[in-house]
Amino acid sequence: MLLALVAAVYWPAVHGGFVWDDDAYFTYNRIKAPDGLYHIWLTTDCADYWPVTSTTLWLEWRLWGGHTFGYHLTNLVLHGGEALLLWAVLRRLGLRGAYVAALLFAVHPVNVESVAWIAERKNLMAMLFALLTVLALARAGLTAGRFQANRWYGLSLLAFLLALLSKASVAPLPVVLLGLVGWARRPSRRDLGLLLPFFGLAVAFAKLNVWFEEHGYVEVVRDVSPGGRLAGAGMVVWFYLSKALLPLRLIMIYPNWALPAGDFRIWLPLGAAAAFSAWLWRARAGAARGALFAWADFCVMLVPVLGFTDIYFMRYALVADHYQHLAMIALLALAGAGWARWQAWRPRGATAAAVVTVGALATLSWSQAGLYRDAETLYLATLRENPDSWLAHNNLGMLWARDGRVAEATAHFRRALQLNPNFAQGHSNLGVTFADSGHPAEALAEFRTAVQLEPILADAHNGLGNTLVETGHLEEGLAELREALRLQPDYPEARNNLGNALAKSGHWAAAVPQYEEALRLRPDFPAAGNNLGVTLEKTGRLAEGIVRLQEVVRLHPAYADAWFNLGLLLHEAGREAEARPAFLEAAQLRADAR
């Protein structure tokens, strides 16, 4: 029943496409490269160190390629596995109501973001291995008074390592493990000694994760004082608790909170959290003991995402649904235990309440999963609840610009820049729209603003260089394109544009390796293949140029320019019988496009 419910609830997302940074995981990532595993595991090329998660995506790329169904289906299966493991763990720990807790977790709307967003695979993997860690430790006697270093203990240590290699935010788990020992008995020196390796791994990976966050991104994420971060942490805890208890109006990008240092009110949530904790502590001898443990577990597992250290997503919002994926199980376990007590007292009422609650949560999750059917639907839903999300305006503008809806895209880019004038990528995106719509002067102004705001933004240098070349400023354009590639050597569009600039300046032989590198980085890059075919002919390699263009039209049969250029090269080679159909195909495609 549990797995069937998971499949039914999340099925609307299975047929969804890529959203937000999903594209980046595959378009410009080592996941597509044959040597990707080396870079994923043994280098600092990636912005974050989640090699187990990245390895699953690397393997799946070999199975599904750019088709999203397989990735979504894997996420769904992983979430079903999480729910089953949670049931098994809670039963092993002797918690009543374990199945109800697992059901609530399986269908809770807050989890939709982790399941439906491919890039959040890391949450699912980390949770899966974290639960395996607890289950194996329970088999090793963690809470039974005979905790020992047997094979189950070794498996638990391995599972925890894999959890950290999936996502380092699982690092607080050893504190929860110590709490589980404390729940059962007074921890002994042997208990502490056996848990010490878990704490060692947690500290090491926490430091590693902070290093990647600090070195993987150069922009300032949050310019907030230590006091502001502490006060903000109190707000974050209550926000997540509210969404766990009443999961309504869930969106991808929540409004960012102002934390004015001089306003005493920002400290009220933290004070309330401290007072609530103190009250639970004083009442711990009675029925509140379980509530104290759940509250402490919830807060401890939230520590990595409370804002004490920077996470790149916090540029846009301090909170996100997927951040509480690991923490929320403590609250749901408490709910399951409470339901079990109620069921023993009023079985019919408790059963009816469970059915209604699970049904309501499942309905909300099914509706929420439907928002992930495509990126446009997701961003429009975000803007309905958070109309001042400059990121949602920018991303929607990018989608509509790609679809040729230039006026609407421009309006969203302008709105994004009104909300955040210092958003360099937004200026660069608006510049691309101006350039593509035949307004080079406006495009140059936007690109120059972007470069001024963020000199290391390769996109802006690429756009500026390409527009300069198109407007006759060849040498200046070449310099900008080379700067883009200095900043981001694995940038296929910039390689292609540099090849075009070199070809335009008559350096045909120098253009060839640029096109070849663009195709190596992005094999499904028809413009680079077309340009390479033409350029090979210019360097006296006519036969190679024909072969290249034949490959382009085979892979992209609707590419009119490639058909036309193939016709030209076949004509030059004296192969008129083959050239004529190529010209006719190009003419037909261009006529159909009018």
What are these regions (language model features)?
Residues 564, 571-592:
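TPR/TPR-like (Sel1-like) alpha-helical repeat modules
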